[in-house]
Regions:
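Start-of-domain marker
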Residues: 21-82
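Beta-strand-rich domain onsets/edges
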Residues: 21-41, 120-190, 244-278
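Short tyrosine-centred short linear motifs in exposed loops/low-complexity segments
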Residues: 37, 92, 99-108, 116, ...
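Short acidic/polar inter-strand loop motif in beta-rich domains
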Residues: 51, 113-120, 238-244
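Short aromatic-acidic-glycine turn motif
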Residues: 65-66, 70-73, 184-196
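Short, acidic Ser/Thr/Gly-rich low-complexity loop/linker segments typical of extracellular
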Residues: 189-217
Length: 278
């Protein structure tokens, strides 16, 4: 095991609070725009996005695309491999292809299986990614998750320093307290020398992951500093769940993936899987 891989293994085993960084990504390349009758490839996997660490992902429990007319389509996803450069090993992931047949805003929605996390909690991940196809919907659409971010800013077409305004809903009501986390998906694995440092030379974790408290009505505002993919995360304790023969605290964890365009013509290339132009 490479030395740097041992460093990250130590960090995530002995500092479990950092495990909030475990995310399920649901992204397409080069961005979240589509065209009529043009096939689009999506990638599904697990990662510590800020560090560019790729992890294995259990088979998703449910995956569907919410179409502009309110109906759903269930694409067939296939198991594939992504490459984790921290340990120089292959990781289990998935991809699927989707061809838009309608103009308007689509939502790609995913529900994970129950996952035992490093901090000895069980999580169920509820993930959504907007796909814009030529025409803007008048009303925001939702996947219908128990925990979900409702956008008050159009969730696509962002550029650097763009601002997003949203509201968190839990069981059909605005969430009255909590926090959201905003994290950039690094297109490359960040080696130790690449990580941001504070004035004492220690890894600057707050710089990598921004956190914002919710208002009493569940509202929040965030901005995106870099072009590429970002994930907004919120989690809520929802009782306990038996996993194996033991009970663990159970959390619903919701991700909203947002793409930010560059001011320049070049696009981010993610080294974990082969870039595609469709």
């Amino acid at each position: 095991m490479p030395f740097l891989g041992l460093i990250f293994l130590f960090i995530f085993l002995f500092f479990p609070e950092i495990s909030f960084g475990y995310k399920i990504f649901l992204i397409s390349l080069p961005d979240n725009y589509g065209a009529l009758k043009k096939e689009k490839t999506f990638y599904v996997g697990a990662a510590e996005p800020a560090f560019g660490l790729i992890l294995d992902l259990k088979t998703p429990k449910n995956l569907y695309v919410l179409l502009p007319n309110g109906t759903t389509e269930k694409p067939t996803f296939l198991k594939t491999e992504f490459f984790d450069r921290s340990l120089n090993t292959k990781r289990v992931g998935y991809n699927f292809k989707f061809t838009p047949n309608n103009e308007g805003d689509h939502l790609v929605c995913l529900e994970s299986d129950y996952t035992l996390l490093r901090d000895k909690t069980v999580g169920k991940f509820l993930v959504k990614t907007p796909l814009h196809v030529l025409k803007e919907n008048k009303e925001p659409t939702l996947c219908g998750f128990d925990l979900e971010i409702k956008p008050y800013t159009r969730p696509y077409g962002f550029k650097k320093h763009g601002v997003f305004w949203g509201q968190v809903w839990y069981q059909n009501k605005p969430l009255s307290s909590g926090e959201i986390e905003v994290e950039y998906f690094s297109p490359v694995f960040l080696r130790e020398e690449d990580l941001p440092k504070d004035s004492y030379g220690q890894i600057n974790y707050p710089y990598l992951k921004n956190k914002v408290r919710l208002s009493k009505n569940g509202f929040f505002v965030v901005s995106f500093e870099n072009p590429g993919w970002w994930v907004i995360t919120v989690k809520v304790r929802s009782g306990e769940k038996t996993y194996g023969n033991q009970k663990y605290p159970f959390y619903l964890i919701h991700h909203l993936w947002i793409y930010v365009f560059s001011d320049k013509k070049e696009q981010n290339t993610y080294e974990y899987f082969e870039p595609r132009s469709n």
